Curated annotation (Swiss-Prot):
Cellular component per GO, a single term: cytoplasm
This protein's pathway: Amino-acid biosynthesis; L-arginine biosynthesis; L-ornithine and N-acetyl-L-glutamate from L-glutamate and N(2)-acetyl-L-ornithine (cyclic): step 1/1
Keywords associated with the record: Acyltransferase, Amino-acid biosynthesis, Arginine biosynthesis, Autocatalytic cleavage, Cytoplasm, Transferase
Protein name: Glutamate N-acetyltransferase
Source taxonomy: Archaea, Methanobacteriati, Methanobacteriota, Methanomada group, Methanococci
Binding site for substrate: T150, K176, T189, E271, N403, T408
Residues flagged as site, Cleavage: A188, T189
Species of origin: Methanococcus maripaludis (strain DSM 14266 / JCM 13030 / NBRC 101832 / S2 / LL)
Compartments, as annotated in UniProt: Cytoplasm
Amino acid sequence: MAENFVVVDGGVVAPKGFKANGHKDRKYGAALIYSEADAVAAGVFTTNKVYAHPVALSKDTLVNNNVFRAIVANSGNANCFTKGGMEDAELLVKKAAELLKIPENQVLSASTGVIGRKMPMDIISLEVERAFENITMESSNENASKAIMTTDAFPKTVAVEFEVNGKSVRIGGIAKGAGMIAPNMLHATMLGFITTDIEISKEDLTNSLQKATDESFNNAVVDGDMSTNDTVYVLANAQSGVKYTDCKEEFDHALTYVSKELAKMIVSDGEGAKKLIEATVFGAETKEDAKKASMSIVRSLLLKTAVFGADPNWGRIAAAVGYSGAEMDMNNFDIIISDISSEKQAILVKAGEQIADCGTPELKLAEEIMKEDKIKIIVDLKMGSFENTAFGCDLGYDYVKINSEYTT
């Protein structure tokens, strides 16, 4: 469908009735997102069987409560696989609740950082206090976004607005993530926090978030590692005066856009990454096949390194699709590389026949496109009518350097 919204400034504080701020002192930081009115909430989490204490705590909180007011998040420590970790997760929530003067069961939490190390609660508590002090003075989406960064190179934020019967609805979000990105969040280190002022039921919000997640965060790959802490939350406080039942399609479309933009920012900021890769697979027999093939492309280390080196080695694309498990006919499929910015296209394979070979204009054009910082790979399987787009990044020297020194 055509875009029914406009992009606006403000991130999580763009919707009515939300405040946010954060504070970070070198390694450790904390962010607070607060709704001035009661809100409903939805969340999706990592499916990793080794999961962090705040994941376990917030899953339970979401199931057993219907009113929410805040999200608290810390960076620098994952609070995962440590003795006393659940108590620390509860203390983090308690600290935020006391400062905001709301019940503890109205606070959702998240953590990101090193796994297996005890939470320095004295430091984290101080960061939460500083975030609260900041939020009482002013609302700062940028500070909140920066406070949850770890190996991120830049803060990630987006917001949109659309109108329903003369009233404005806004959706805003922030995210963090650069490494350990291959989420699979069925019920997503990568953290995403989204706010909206629409009036919506908890059930509808959960369904909308799941659909948006499936099309965005669950299609994002940096390094193929699934974090123990992946989490996405949405808070909806009804302050716009617009009901979801009056704009289901428009809201779901806008929420998916916000989620996709955050997901693309995350993979663009893959540790040491220089290029964004979008892989779209058309003509698949099933949606599952389209996802298998597109994810296989962006997950391929050989393809990632080829993109890093601006090498139009289309054989790596063909191989990745071939081993993905998707149904295909090697004698009847297309591969195209295009530049997202200029829409230049190079046809590499057509109906199973090689088009780009040494010395051909197609290969020369592909070489030029591969030098760009946003590259789209298109594969038509010619097996059916389903499609999927996955997001990834190149893989270079800096990824090894950053991750070999992460705990030192």
